[in-house]
Amino acid sequence: KEADTYLAQDSVNWGNDAENPFKAYRGHRMNKYAAKALQARVLLYRGGSEDLAEAGRIAKEVIGQCGLKLVRDNFQDIAMFDETLFALHMDDMEDRLESYFNVSAADDGSALWITPTNAEGAFEVTSSVGRNDIRYKFGYGLYNGGTKGLMCRKYLPTQNYVYKENLPLIRLGEMYLIAAEATGDAEYLNDLRNARGISAVYDLDEVTETALDAEYRKEFFAEGQYFYFLKRHAMKTFYRCPPSLEGKMSSFQYVFPLTDDEKEYN
């Protein structure tokens, strides 16, 4: 709330401004709507009835006032930076991730390929729902490596400097998910799904945990927010859960162990 007071007159400008470079790429700096989006995320996680009502209100405010639109084509903007409320830029991201996101023939075996069958299940392609989903489509969400499998394109190198080495932390799409869960209004889920390429033929009539699980899984594929959705809902299992943990996920699995440095130096 204090941030909201200080940022009340924040002049958000998402585009380039040659006369005032500071205003350009506002999504790379904490701004009014990034602060509000973070507040909505925290309130949703806290989960009380008043928290949910406020989370829904704030999410709808961000959707209506931030000036950004949901990405409908991620061929160039694979990480959906054009709808990002707050992001980081990592100069050496491509070098750091090269061994994991590497489509070259020289791959040493550490690259993160997924099988077509696993991808089809994750994005609901087997039921035809996600066949045109840009988060899945080859050349859009996924790279088709032939016999090697498929790979998420979010972290692959690009020559487009606008989208190069960007690491989104909060995107507009998450506000639609928060609004849907907090208010129970399926229209927000359908708006997100339609923008990503899912036909209105498959529109949902209600917001269920199963529907939210599917959309979080697809929207944050190869990202971290899906983990926190699973933790927040105390999910006992998830898509492609290891057989040894199927139906047995508990708070123990949802708490990261302390690092060795923290144990040693407190």
Predicted regions and their residues:
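Short, cationic low-complexity segments
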Residues: 106-123, 130
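Acidic/polar-rich alpha-helix caps and helix-coil junctions
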Residues: 1-102, 113, 126-266
